[in-house]
Protein backbone atom coordinates (compact mmCIF):
# COMPACT_ATOMS: atom_id res chain seq x y z
CA UNK A 1 0.00 0.00 0.00
CA UNK A 2 1.34 3.42 -0.96
CA UNK A 3 0.84 6.15 1.64
CA UNK A 4 2.07 9.72 1.25
CA UNK A 5 1.66 10.34 5.00
CA UNK A 6 3.96 7.41 5.83
CA UNK A 7 6.48 8.32 3.10
CA UNK A 8 6.69 11.87 4.47
CA UNK A 9 7.24 10.54 8.02
CA UNK A 10 4.00 12.18 9.20
CA UNK A 11 2.27 8.99 10.40
CA UNK A 12 3.68 5.69 11.62
CA UNK A 13 0.45 3.90 12.64
CA UNK A 14 0.84 1.25 9.90
CA UNK A 15 4.19 -0.09 11.07
CA UNK A 16 4.24 -2.99 8.58
CA UNK A 17 3.24 -0.94 5.53
CA UNK A 18 6.50 -1.64 3.67
CA UNK A 19 5.97 -5.42 3.85
CA UNK A 20 3.88 -7.13 1.14
CA UNK A 21 0.63 -8.64 2.48
CA UNK A 22 1.80 -12.29 2.01
CA UNK A 23 4.85 -11.50 4.21
CA UNK A 24 2.61 -9.87 6.83
CA UNK A 25 0.36 -12.95 6.89
CA UNK A 26 3.37 -15.26 7.24
CA UNK A 27 4.68 -13.23 10.19
CA UNK A 28 1.27 -13.20 11.91
CA UNK A 29 0.83 -16.95 11.35
CA UNK A 30 4.30 -17.59 12.81
CA UNK A 31 3.41 -15.46 15.85
CA UNK A 32 0.16 -17.38 16.38
CA UNK A 33 1.85 -20.78 15.99
CA UNK A 34 4.50 -19.70 18.49
CA UNK A 35 1.83 -18.65 21.03
CA UNK A 36 0.03 -22.01 20.64
CA UNK A 37 3.23 -24.09 20.47
CA UNK A 38 2.43 -25.86 23.76
CA UNK A 39 -0.93 -27.14 22.48
CA UNK A 40 -1.45 -29.79 19.81
CA UNK A 41 -3.60 -28.24 17.05
CA UNK A 42 -5.55 -30.70 14.92
CA UNK A 43 -6.19 -28.36 11.96
CA UNK A 44 -4.68 -25.04 10.89
CA UNK A 45 -7.12 -23.40 8.46
CA UNK A 46 -5.78 -21.02 5.78
CA UNK A 47 -5.66 -17.37 6.95
CA UNK A 48 -8.39 -15.02 5.72
CA UNK A 49 -7.55 -11.54 4.42
CA UNK A 50 -9.39 -8.70 2.67
CA UNK A 51 -8.52 -5.52 0.74
CA UNK A 52 -5.25 -3.86 1.76
CA UNK A 53 -6.59 -0.30 1.55
CA UNK A 54 -9.89 1.57 1.73
CA UNK A 55 -11.29 -1.16 4.00
CA UNK A 56 -12.09 0.74 7.20
CA UNK A 57 -15.73 1.56 7.96
CA UNK A 58 -14.84 3.94 10.79
CA UNK A 59 -12.74 7.07 11.28
CA UNK A 60 -11.84 8.36 14.74
CA UNK A 61 -10.45 11.85 14.20
CA UNK A 62 -8.91 14.12 16.83
CA UNK A 63 -9.94 17.69 16.00
CA UNK A 64 -7.18 20.28 16.37
CA UNK A 65 -6.02 23.50 14.69
CA UNK A 66 -8.31 26.54 14.75
CA UNK A 67 -12.04 26.98 14.24
CA UNK A 68 -11.32 28.61 10.84
CA UNK A 69 -8.79 25.94 9.82
CA UNK A 70 -9.54 22.72 11.69
CA UNK A 71 -7.37 19.63 11.30
CA UNK A 72 -8.89 16.14 11.49
CA UNK A 73 -6.50 13.36 12.43
CA UNK A 74 -4.26 12.76 15.42
CA UNK A 75 -1.83 14.38 17.84
CA UNK A 76 1.78 13.24 17.92
CA UNK A 77 3.31 12.43 21.31
CA UNK A 78 4.71 15.97 21.53
CA UNK A 79 1.23 17.41 20.90
CA UNK A 80 1.84 18.37 17.26
CA UNK A 81 -1.35 17.92 15.21
CA UNK A 82 -1.48 15.84 12.02
CA UNK A 83 -4.29 15.90 9.44
CA UNK A 84 -5.12 12.34 8.31
CA UNK A 85 -8.01 12.99 5.89
CA UNK A 86 -5.92 11.42 3.09
CA UNK A 87 -5.25 8.17 5.01
CA UNK A 88 -5.54 5.34 2.42
CA UNK A 89 -7.19 3.01 4.97
CA UNK A 90 -10.38 5.08 4.56
CA UNK A 91 -12.71 4.44 1.61
CA UNK A 92 -13.09 7.16 -1.06
CA UNK A 93 -16.58 7.90 0.31
CA UNK A 94 -15.04 9.50 3.44
CA UNK A 95 -13.26 12.31 1.52
CA UNK A 96 -16.36 14.41 0.73
CA UNK A 97 -17.50 14.08 4.35
CA UNK A 98 -14.17 15.36 5.71
CA UNK A 99 -14.21 18.14 3.07
CA UNK A 100 -17.68 19.34 4.18
CA UNK A 101 -16.95 18.99 7.91
CA UNK A 102 -14.11 21.52 7.91
CA UNK A 103 -16.22 24.51 6.78
CA UNK A 104 -19.09 23.23 8.94
CA UNK A 105 -16.90 23.39 12.06
CA UNK A 106 -16.26 27.07 11.25
CA UNK A 107 -19.96 27.75 10.48
CA UNK A 108 -21.08 26.20 13.78
CA UNK A 109 -18.28 27.89 15.74
CA UNK A 110 -17.06 24.57 17.17
CA UNK A 111 -13.68 25.58 18.58
CA UNK A 112 -11.28 22.61 18.50
CA UNK A 113 -10.24 21.46 21.96
CA UNK A 114 -6.67 22.46 22.82
CA UNK A 115 -5.17 19.76 25.06
CA UNK A 116 -2.27 21.90 26.32
CA UNK A 117 -4.49 24.85 27.26
CA UNK A 118 -7.51 22.74 28.30
CA UNK A 119 -9.70 25.09 26.24
CA UNK A 120 -12.11 24.64 23.34
CA UNK A 121 -15.12 22.41 22.75
CA UNK A 122 -14.81 19.96 19.82
CA UNK A 123 -12.62 16.99 20.77
CA UNK A 124 -13.31 14.26 18.21
CA UNK A 125 -15.22 13.49 15.03
CA UNK A 126 -16.35 9.83 14.80
CA UNK A 127 -17.62 8.63 11.42
CA UNK A 128 -19.03 5.16 10.62
CA UNK A 129 -20.24 3.90 7.24
CA UNK A 130 -22.64 1.05 6.47
CA UNK A 131 -21.49 -1.28 3.69
CA UNK A 132 -25.06 -2.29 2.88
CA UNK A 133 -26.43 1.08 1.78
CA UNK A 134 -23.63 3.66 2.20
CA UNK A 135 -25.50 5.39 5.04
CA UNK A 136 -23.30 7.07 7.66
CA UNK A 137 -23.32 7.85 11.38
CA UNK A 138 -21.56 11.03 12.49
CA UNK A 139 -20.77 11.82 16.12
CA UNK A 140 -19.41 15.12 17.44
CA UNK A 141 -17.58 14.60 20.74
CA UNK A 142 -17.82 17.88 22.69
CA UNK A 143 -16.47 18.94 26.07
CA UNK A 144 -19.84 20.39 27.14
CA UNK A 145 -23.27 21.40 25.83
CA UNK A 146 -22.15 25.05 25.43
CA UNK A 147 -22.10 24.93 21.60
CA UNK A 148 -25.03 22.53 21.18
CA UNK A 149 -27.56 25.21 20.12
CA UNK A 150 -25.10 26.61 17.55
CA UNK A 151 -24.48 23.13 16.18
CA UNK A 152 -28.21 22.40 15.85
CA UNK A 153 -28.75 25.72 14.06
CA UNK A 154 -25.98 25.05 11.51
CA UNK A 155 -26.86 21.36 10.99
CA UNK A 156 -29.37 21.72 8.08
CA UNK A 157 -26.52 23.03 5.88
CA UNK A 158 -24.42 19.93 6.61
CA UNK A 159 -27.36 17.58 6.01
CA UNK A 160 -27.99 19.28 2.67
CA UNK A 161 -24.34 18.77 1.67
CA UNK A 162 -24.24 15.18 2.94
CA UNK A 163 -27.61 13.39 2.64
CA UNK A 164 -25.81 10.09 3.40
CA UNK A 165 -25.62 11.15 7.08
CA UNK A 166 -28.47 9.06 8.52
CA UNK A 167 -27.56 9.27 12.23
CA UNK A 168 -26.00 12.39 13.79
CA UNK A 169 -25.29 12.75 17.50
CA UNK A 170 -23.39 14.82 20.02
CA UNK A 171 -21.46 12.97 22.71
CA UNK A 172 -20.42 14.87 25.83
CA UNK A 173 -16.96 14.01 27.14
CA UNK A 174 -16.10 16.56 29.88
CA UNK A 175 -12.92 14.94 31.23
CA UNK A 176 -9.43 16.23 30.37
CA UNK A 177 -8.16 12.78 29.38
CA UNK A 178 -7.62 10.88 26.12
CA UNK A 179 -11.00 9.15 26.41
CA UNK A 180 -12.88 8.88 23.12
CA UNK A 181 -16.43 9.29 24.45
CA UNK A 182 -18.50 10.15 27.51
CA UNK A 183 -21.74 8.65 28.79
CA UNK A 184 -24.16 11.29 27.47
CA UNK A 185 -25.34 10.89 23.86
CA UNK A 186 -27.67 13.49 22.32
CA UNK A 187 -29.41 12.51 19.08
CA UNK A 188 -29.79 15.23 16.44
CA UNK A 189 -31.62 12.98 13.96
CA UNK A 190 -34.78 10.91 14.24
CA UNK A 191 -32.90 7.77 13.16
CA UNK A 192 -30.80 6.41 16.05
CA UNK A 193 -29.12 3.34 14.52
CA UNK A 194 -27.26 2.62 11.29
CA UNK A 195 -28.47 -0.38 9.28
CA UNK A 196 -25.79 -2.88 8.20
CA UNK A 197 -25.98 -6.31 6.58
CA UNK A 198 -23.42 -9.14 6.57
CA UNK A 199 -24.15 -12.43 4.76
CA UNK A 200 -27.89 -11.59 4.58
CA UNK A 201 -28.00 -11.07 8.36
CA UNK A 202 -29.36 -7.63 9.40
CA UNK A 203 -27.12 -5.85 11.92
CA UNK A 204 -27.52 -2.47 13.60
CA UNK A 205 -24.87 0.00 14.76
CA UNK A 206 -25.72 2.47 17.52
CA UNK A 207 -23.40 5.26 18.75
CA UNK A 208 -22.00 3.49 21.82
CA UNK A 209 -21.95 -0.07 20.50
CA UNK A 210 -18.72 -1.76 19.39
CA UNK A 211 -18.61 -2.85 15.74
CA UNK A 212 -15.72 -4.39 13.80
CA UNK A 213 -13.81 -1.83 11.69
CA UNK A 214 -12.98 -4.16 8.76
CA UNK A 215 -16.34 -5.31 7.31
CA UNK A 216 -14.84 -7.44 4.49
CA UNK A 217 -12.96 -9.64 6.98
CA UNK A 218 -15.55 -9.42 9.79
CA UNK A 219 -18.28 -10.80 7.51
CA UNK A 220 -16.00 -13.76 6.71
CA UNK A 221 -15.30 -14.26 10.43
CA UNK A 222 -19.04 -14.45 11.23
CA UNK A 223 -19.74 -16.73 8.25
CA UNK A 224 -16.93 -19.07 9.37
CA UNK A 225 -18.32 -19.23 12.93
CA UNK A 226 -21.73 -20.09 11.45
CA UNK A 227 -20.17 -22.88 9.34
CA UNK A 228 -18.28 -24.31 12.33
CA UNK A 229 -21.41 -24.32 14.53
CA UNK A 230 -23.55 -25.94 11.82
CA UNK A 231 -21.11 -28.89 11.76
CA UNK A 232 -21.62 -29.52 15.50
CA UNK A 233 -24.52 -31.26 17.33
CA UNK A 234 -25.64 -28.07 19.08
CA UNK A 235 -29.18 -27.13 20.13
CA UNK A 236 -28.28 -24.70 22.94
CA UNK A 237 -25.46 -22.13 22.95
CA UNK A 238 -24.28 -18.98 24.69
CA UNK A 239 -22.71 -16.01 22.88
CA UNK A 240 -20.69 -14.17 25.56
CA UNK A 241 -19.30 -10.62 25.03
CA UNK A 242 -21.73 -10.65 22.08
CA UNK A 243 -21.66 -6.95 21.09
CA UNK A 244 -24.37 -6.22 18.51
CA UNK A 245 -24.91 -9.98 18.13
CA UNK A 246 -22.84 -10.65 14.99
CA UNK A 247 -21.82 -14.18 16.00
CA UNK A 248 -25.09 -15.28 17.61
CA UNK A 249 -27.27 -13.95 14.79
CA UNK A 250 -25.17 -15.84 12.24
CA UNK A 251 -25.07 -19.10 14.24
CA UNK A 252 -28.70 -19.26 15.39
CA UNK A 253 -31.25 -21.53 13.74
CA UNK A 254 -35.04 -21.43 14.39
CA UNK A 255 -34.87 -24.51 16.66
CA UNK A 256 -31.72 -23.48 18.56
CA UNK A 257 -31.87 -21.90 22.01
CA UNK A 258 -29.29 -19.11 22.11
CA UNK A 259 -28.51 -16.51 24.77
CA UNK A 260 -26.30 -13.52 23.94
CA UNK A 261 -24.73 -11.52 26.78
CA UNK A 262 -23.03 -8.11 26.53
CA UNK A 263 -22.51 -5.42 29.18
CA UNK A 264 -23.22 -2.50 26.79
CA UNK A 265 -26.98 -1.87 26.65
CA UNK A 266 -26.68 0.05 23.36
CA UNK A 267 -25.22 -3.03 21.68
CA UNK A 268 -27.94 -5.27 23.15
CA UNK A 269 -30.62 -2.93 21.73
CA UNK A 270 -29.04 -3.50 18.29
CA UNK A 271 -28.93 -7.29 18.74
CA UNK A 272 -32.58 -7.46 19.86
CA UNK A 273 -33.67 -5.42 16.83
CA UNK A 274 -31.86 -7.85 14.48
CA UNK A 275 -33.30 -10.95 16.21
CA UNK A 276 -36.82 -9.52 15.87
CA UNK A 277 -36.26 -8.87 12.14
CA UNK A 278 -35.07 -12.45 11.64
CA UNK A 279 -38.05 -13.82 13.59
CA UNK A 280 -35.77 -15.85 15.88
CA UNK A 281 -37.96 -16.32 18.96
CA UNK A 282 -35.59 -18.67 20.83
CA UNK A 283 -32.77 -16.15 20.62
CA UNK A 284 -32.50 -13.76 23.57
CA UNK A 285 -30.02 -10.99 24.33
CA UNK A 286 -29.38 -9.48 27.77
CA UNK A 287 -27.28 -6.53 28.94
CA UNK A 288 -25.20 -8.16 31.70
CA UNK A 289 -21.59 -8.82 32.63
CA UNK A 290 -20.64 -12.00 30.71
CA UNK A 291 -18.64 -13.58 33.55
CA UNK A 292 -21.30 -12.82 36.19
CA UNK A 293 -24.04 -14.19 33.92
CA UNK A 294 -22.20 -17.43 33.12
CA UNK A 295 -21.07 -18.20 36.66
CA UNK A 296 -24.64 -17.75 37.98
CA UNK A 297 -26.10 -20.38 35.61
CA UNK A 298 -26.74 -24.00 36.50
CA UNK A 299 -27.87 -24.99 33.02
CA UNK A 300 -24.93 -25.66 30.69
CA UNK A 301 -25.26 -25.28 26.89
CA UNK A 302 -23.46 -27.61 24.47
CA UNK A 303 -21.47 -24.68 23.07
CA UNK A 304 -20.14 -21.44 24.53
CA UNK A 305 -18.85 -18.83 22.07
CA UNK A 306 -16.69 -16.08 23.58
CA UNK A 307 -15.44 -12.92 21.86
CA UNK A 308 -13.83 -10.94 24.69
CA UNK A 309 -11.97 -7.61 24.59
CA UNK A 310 -8.15 -7.62 24.44
CA UNK A 311 -7.78 -8.64 28.09
CA UNK A 312 -9.32 -12.08 27.38
CA UNK A 313 -12.00 -13.92 29.37
CA UNK A 314 -9.93 -14.18 32.57
CA UNK A 315 -9.43 -16.85 35.23
CA UNK A 316 -12.91 -16.79 36.91
CA UNK A 317 -14.68 -17.55 33.61
CA UNK A 318 -12.01 -20.11 32.62
CA UNK A 319 -12.45 -21.88 35.98
CA UNK A 320 -16.23 -21.88 35.56
CA UNK A 321 -16.05 -23.29 32.01
CA UNK A 322 -13.61 -25.97 33.18
CA UNK A 323 -16.04 -27.03 35.92
CA UNK A 324 -19.26 -26.83 33.91
CA UNK A 325 -17.53 -28.38 30.88
CA UNK A 326 -19.60 -27.47 27.81
CA UNK A 327 -18.79 -29.88 24.99
CA UNK A 328 -17.52 -27.11 22.68
CA UNK A 329 -16.00 -23.64 23.10
CA UNK A 330 -15.43 -21.27 20.18
CA UNK A 331 -12.96 -18.56 21.20
CA UNK A 332 -12.70 -15.50 18.93
CA UNK A 333 -9.95 -13.13 19.97
CA UNK A 334 -8.28 -9.87 18.91
CA UNK A 335 -5.33 -10.69 21.20
CA UNK A 336 -3.84 -14.15 20.70
CA UNK A 337 -1.57 -13.69 23.75
CA UNK A 338 -4.47 -13.52 26.21
CA UNK A 339 -6.32 -16.25 24.29
CA UNK A 340 -3.33 -18.60 24.69
CA UNK A 341 -3.18 -17.71 28.39
CA UNK A 342 -6.90 -18.48 28.77
CA UNK A 343 -6.61 -21.80 26.89
CA UNK A 344 -3.90 -22.79 29.37
CA UNK A 345 -6.57 -22.35 32.07
CA UNK A 346 -8.89 -24.79 30.23
CA UNK A 347 -6.89 -28.03 30.65
CA UNK A 348 -9.76 -30.37 29.77
CA UNK A 349 -9.99 -29.08 26.19
CA UNK A 350 -8.10 -29.83 22.99
CA UNK A 351 -7.75 -27.46 20.02
CA UNK A 352 -9.53 -28.90 17.02
CA UNK A 353 -9.26 -25.94 14.66
CA UNK A 354 -7.58 -22.52 14.43
CA UNK A 355 -8.01 -19.80 11.81
CA UNK A 356 -6.37 -16.37 11.54
CA UNK A 357 -8.36 -13.40 10.20
CA UNK A 358 -6.28 -10.42 9.05
CA UNK A 359 -8.59 -7.74 10.42
CA UNK A 360 -5.78 -5.16 10.82
CA UNK A 361 -3.47 -5.12 7.75
CA UNK A 362 -0.11 -3.28 7.97
CA UNK A 363 0.06 -3.82 11.76
CA UNK A 364 1.11 -6.74 13.97
CA UNK A 365 -2.51 -7.20 15.13
CA UNK A 366 -4.91 -9.87 13.92
CA UNK A 367 -8.10 -11.70 14.90
CA UNK A 368 -8.07 -15.45 15.55
CA UNK A 369 -10.84 -18.01 16.02
CA UNK A 370 -10.30 -21.34 17.77
CA UNK A 371 -12.57 -24.36 18.23
CA UNK A 372 -11.98 -26.16 21.53
CA UNK A 373 -13.47 -29.60 22.15
CA UNK A 374 -13.92 -31.27 25.56
CA UNK A 375 -11.58 -34.25 25.86
Curated annotation (Swiss-Prot):
Family: Belongs to the class I-like SAM-binding methyltransferase superfamily. RNA M5U methyltransferase family. RlmC subfamily.
Name of the gene this protein is made from: rlmC
Binding-site list for [4Fe-4S] cluster: 3, 11, 14, 87
Family annotation (InterPro entries): 23SrRNA_MeTrfase_RlmC (IPR011825), MeTrfase_TrmA_AS (IPR030390), MeTrfase_TrmA_CS (IPR030391), SAM-dependent_MTases_sf (IPR029063), U5_MeTrfase_fam (IPR010280)
Domain of life: Bacteria
GO MF annotation list: 4 iron, 4 sulfur cluster binding; iron ion binding; rRNA (uridine-C5-)-methyltransferase activity
Chain residues that bind S-adenosyl-L-methionine: 212, 241, 262, 307
Protein name in UniProt: 23S rRNA (uracil(747)-C(5))-methyltransferase RlmC
NCBIfam families found in the cross-reference section: meth_trns_rumB
EC number: 2.1.1.189
Function: Catalyzes the formation of 5-methyl-uridine at position 747 (m5U747) in 23S rRNA.
Catalysed reactions listed for this entry: uridine(747) in 23S rRNA + S-adenosyl-L-methionine = 5-methyluridine(747) in 23S rRNA + S-adenosyl-L-homocysteine + H(+)
Ranges that cross the membrane: none
Catalytic machinery residues: 334
Cited PANTHER family: RNA M5U METHYLTRANSFERASE, TRNA (URACIL(54)-C(5))-METHYLTRANSFERASE
